[in-house]
Amino acid sequence: TADLRRCGLVCGVNPSLGQVDYYAYGPWENYSDRKDGCMIGRYADTVEGMEVAYVKPQSMGNREGLRELKLTGIDGKGICIQTEGQVSFSALRYTDEDMMNCNHMWELKPRPYIVLHLDAAMRGVGNASCGQDVDTLPAYQVPQKELSYKLRFTSCTKE
């Protein structure tokens, strides 16, 4: 399908695993065409801290270049995901559909689970803020070809 927004895996995760530790571009949200101001490194946050308070809800909280992700509880126990290949991720309390169907952030109702996206490709943001509708450049669109990555899931405990 042409013009996909993202291509990858989405799953629900136990809501008690709200501590997020990752090795990727950060510490702010970033996209393929919006990551020059971010650095590869290890960052820690919470699922709620990954939200961005946009005027209108939309996809948010993406991190590019993921190599390792730990989702843990306050006791330090949880899941560890190591990656191989291009992977981006987001961990939120909302689905994409939830965000597309609301006009204001206060209308969003948190899901009873964490919505985890692990994507092989995520469409860039593009730019329509300059008075002209400028689409996402082809280099930052989801390619129409076979995409693959490897994910290794293990349990993790406090180090």
Identify the residue ranges that each predicted region occupies.
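Beta-strand/loop-rich accessory regions of lumenal/periplasmic or secreted enzymes
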Residues: T1-E159
